[in-house]
């Protein structure tokens, strides 16, 4: 039982009609009672993050957001194996600094895009065993790129068709606290097609294809050689129907 004050704040300054500057600061607090009940008493994870950035228009219908951030966290839980047994402990201080870039909007009347890129420099700063190591499951590079094309009316009666395709990926990540091995980076491709029947209540059939090349990849590690790695979703196809009321 108890309470914790977690302040946060931000400010936005509109430099011009097309350019906004912003800054945010926030403290974080996360109890670790769910795992502490099994592994023993663990202190809560606490941290503070700072972010500055700008939102602006690149061209008519195309906007971008660029942000710089730094985040410090203490008491970050990690697992390790000692004499065949898995234990959970906490690192003294973990720092992550990076940049995020997002671009979205219309390239033409028919073609639109969403693109993102992130760079993260993360390191364990204070820990008797792992100081200077790369934190588990934190990629240095992440990114995605997706295009959507609107064919407009197809098949008559006002019926419309949209298709899209893109890719998402991440760079290599530390698989264990000692950095003895790394999960390899990956890029997977996705696609979709949506056909809308113009009726009294428009009906849309949409086919979503995930990992269309059926690439084997790993999304994360438990951080312990005893427990292994999480394999990414294989190829899947999902057809959905929706009605607009």
Where are these regions (language model features)?
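Residue-level signature of outer-membrane beta-barrel architecture
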Residues: 12-15, 44, 54-56, 105-109, ...
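Outer-membrane beta-barrel translocator domains and adjoining extracellular loop/strand segments
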Residues: 32-40, 76-84, 120-132, 173-181, ...
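Signature of Gram-negative outer-membrane beta-barrel scaffolds
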Residues: 1-16, 37
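Conserved C-terminal beta-signal and adjacent last beta-strands/turns
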Residues: 23, 50-51, 136-245
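Short coil turns and loop connectors of transmembrane beta-barrels in diderm outer membranes
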Residues: 15-18, 58-60, 74, 107-109, ...
């Amino acid at each position: 039982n108890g309470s914790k004050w977690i302040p946060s704040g931000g400010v936005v300054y509109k430099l011009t009609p097309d350019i906004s500057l912003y800054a945010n600061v926030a403290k974080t607090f996360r109890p670790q009672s769910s795992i502490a009940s099994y592994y023993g008493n663990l202190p809560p994870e606490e941290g503070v993050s700072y972010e500055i950035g700008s939102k602006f228009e690149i061209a008519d219908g195309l906007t971008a957001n660029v942000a710089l951030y730094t985040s410090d966290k203490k008491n970050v839980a990690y697992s390790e194996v000692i004499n065949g047994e898995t234990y959970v402990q906490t690192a003294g201080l973990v720092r992550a600094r990076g940049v995020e870039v997002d671009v979205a909007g219309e390239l033409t009347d028919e073609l639109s895009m969403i693109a993102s890129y992130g760079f993260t420099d993360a390191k364990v700063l204070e820990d008797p065993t792992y100081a200077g190591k790369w934190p588990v499951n934190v990629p240095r590079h992440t990114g995605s790129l997706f295009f959507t094309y609107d064919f407009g009316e197809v098949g008559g009666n006002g019926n419309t068709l949209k298709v899209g395709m893109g890719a998402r990926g991440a760079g290599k990540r530390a698989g264990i606290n000692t950095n003895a091995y790394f999960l390899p980076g990956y890029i997977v491709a996705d696609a979709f097609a949506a056909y809308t029947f113009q009726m009294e209540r428009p009906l849309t059939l949409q086919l979503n294809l995930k990992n269309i090349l059926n690439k084997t990849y790993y999304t994360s590690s438990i951080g312990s050689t005893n427990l292994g790695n999480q394999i990414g979703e294989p190829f899947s196809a999902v057809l959905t129907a929706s009605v607009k009321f």
